[in-house]
Amino acid sequence: MLFGRLTERAQRVLAHAQEEAIRLNHSNIGTEHLLLGLMKEPEGIAAKVLVSFNITEDKVIEEVEKLIGHGQEQMGTLHYTPRAKKVIELSMDEARKLHHNFVGTEHILLGLIRENEGVAARVFANLDLNITKARAQVVKALGSPEMSNKNAQANKSNNTPTLDGLARDLTVIAKDGTLDPVVGRDKEITRVIEVLSRRTKNNPVLIGEPGVGKTAIAEGLAQAIVKNEVPETLKDKRVMSLDMGTVVAGTKYRGEFEERLKKVMEEIHQAGNVILFIDELHTLVGAGGAEGAIDASNILKPALARGELQCIGATTLDEYRKNIEKDAALERRFQPIQVDEPTVEDTIEILKGLRDRYEAHHRINISDEALEAAAKLSDRYVSDRFLPDKAIDLIDEASSKVRLKSHTTPSNLKEIEQEIDKVKNEKDAAVHAQEFENAANLRDKQSKLEKQYEDAKNEWKNAQGGLDTALSEENIAEVIAGWTGIPLTKINETESDRLLNLEDTLHKRVIGQNDAVNSISKAVRRARAGLKDPKRPIGSFIFLGPTGVGKTELARALAESMFGEDDAMIRVDMSEFMEKHAVSRLVGAPPGYVGHDDGGQLTEKVRRKPYSVILFDEIEKAHPDVFNILLQVLDDGHLTDTKGRTVDFRNTVIIMTSNVGAQELQDQRFAGFGGASEGSDYETVRKTMMKELKNSFRPEFLNRVDDIIVFHKLTKDELKEIVTMMVNKLTHRLSEQNINIVVTDKAKEKIAEEGYDPEYGARPLIRAIQKTVEDNLSELILDGNKIEGKEVTIDHDGKEFKYDIYEITAKKETTES
């Protein structure tokens, strides 16, 4: 907070505020202590104005003690509350509006009046202070704004009228204290000062990724000039931020743009104390260069080379390479200064420097833990943006969310509002119908409700005023989860139970295959508990086994349990990648080829949904070289697409399915997967499968996979369970047509028997159900049998399937197939 611009009396007010907080044993300095501090300076304008409204020091003390009372014995350093910080900020804003160089007691009072929340605002309300009249009285007591300040400002601006209309003076903004503090960029600011102090080509250009703080360095220079922390050569300089869009805007005719830019350059040359800051420096190239006219960069080149124009540029690495480097004459006139992304530790320090501003704006307390969480979580989970920008945005949005949540109107107030509206409408209807007695009763009822509403509203506001809303680590995690879809909040009891019982959830859809289900469940639990390797995917698995045993179904079931729907799974059918060059479809077509701008089928989906299940189905069908691209995904959790963007796979579950080796195992007596689920038989099966797998895939690929799981052949009992699941799905579909079906155990056993084929797994069951159930039901529906609203029982008598149709309460009719 900038206390250097406070008058001596205003500084004493802050000292009195601290003394009052200590006297009342309060742990923070709030708006009420600032008000008490103002009353302790009776000669100040603020105290005189308040006394003129019959508000005395004793009355204020009485109200404050009544509202918040004395605290426990306070310990440690006193800090300003977010609302008190906001009041100081508002007082500086008031001083600037009135063209005053210093902040006095009167400006602090104006700040308290503008801050309509907090204890001070409640004191004013309780003492019946007319806010509008009080403000007018303060302005009247001050007299007219100081003309000397206005004239000084006018004289300063008269030298550069065109420039003032097109640019923002960062030094003036820094003097007003409205620029955010710049933390941890001393090295870069010093380097900028060194380049600016050169005799010729004294033009630094700040190059760095978006969001690393390039513009902040120019603002830091302006603040250093205001504080006199620069060499003699830069003292009293003005840093003017020029927007090329504003310069070009409105130049309808040829030569108008060039004339405007020349005038700006002449004013800068004559003034001799202007440093031009051009954000997005690459916009110089081509600006105003339509119809053969020369562009802005060519107009500026001579002045930049001779040192007549001091210019700081800022641009990204990509734009510098595309626009500045290709023009060698322009490039040599600028001295590049690399601005690197700060570390997580540096980002935490930057956030601590900005904390006061965000606390004042959102009127909440921001803890150190929240700042650390913002820096660490944004660094880990938001991979396509840069620190400190993404961490600052995270703090800003989380603070906004907490603030809005704490100020949502309670339901009882909304109910009273609705009741008032209802009574108003009834009263208007009664007046219209000339039922005046009824209208009078309704008017009285409305008055009572309005009073009740005001009382409830004041009670809620008073309760809110006494609360110190704080931003916690959990709030930061909630916002990150909203941005990325990755669950980071603390695990609640419901989710904990769901994760612990994940095997049961998966078994509702996948019958048998305990090894696969257990392995997948453990990987998900490790990730959610925060124990997984942060540089690798949540888990990577190869599912081996014959067709139709549930490999793909398990991936679908996992996607449904994690995201609520099977469609959340990213499915890549490897049969589409039988040719070597097809790998480009995963990461995007190379430059110059059709589809380069569309991105890769895999990388784009993962960029949009970083928390997902990825299924590579039937991997043995793809060309072996396709899997080379997955090596760094399995090991380091990232993949670079054809546009050079790094895609983060660290929050994905990667599942690959294959039935490689299934034929060889089928030829062996024990290796039909049946009865080989445990003991040495299962190990033999596994070794056989691994041998076939090694013949098909390279060792460096297999070595990176977390687990290779062999699926077992489905037994008859398991097939019967699958029949029950399939019948339940059919029952659900028919219930939408108001048809109820019941399939007996005998019928299910017969369907399982007809659909049993150890070579093809569960898929023949689909055909068996179609043949025995669906075909006959469709004929019954189309044959004129009105079975809507009736129940159909499907049974097997040892020879054939029987279909009994009957009303829910009536006797059965019997038809046979």
Swiss-Prot record:
Positions annotated to bind ATP: 208-215, 545-552
InterPro entries xref list: AAA+_ATPase, ATPase_AAA_core, Clp_ATPase_C, Clp_N_dom_sf, Clp_R_dom, ClpA/B, ClpA/B_CS1, ClpA/B_CS2
Region (I): 163-410
A single Gene Ontology CC term: cytoplasm
GO terms (BP aspect): cellular response to heat
Chain segments carrying region II: 471-662
SUPFAM superfamilies: Double Clp-N motif, P-loop containing nucleoside triphosphate hydrolases
Residue ranges of domain UVR in the record: 417-452
Keyword Chaperone on entry: yes
Repeat 2: region residues: 80-144
Record carries keyword Metal-binding: no
Top-level taxon: Bacteria
GO molecular function terms attached to this record: ATP binding; ATP hydrolysis activity
A Pfam family: ClpB_D2-small
Region annotation (Repeat 1) ranges: 6-71
Similarity field: Belongs to the ClpA/ClpB family. ClpC subfamily.
Function: Required for growth at high temperatures, probably by acting as a chaperone during heat shock and targeting heat-denatured proteins for degradation by ClpP.
Protein name: ATP-dependent Clp protease ATP-binding subunit ClpC
Organism: Staphylococcus epidermidis (strain ATCC 35984 / DSM 28319 / BCRC 17069 / CCUG 31568 / BM 3577 / RP62A)
Highest classification ranks of the organism: Bacteria, Bacillati, Bacillota, Bacilli, Bacillales
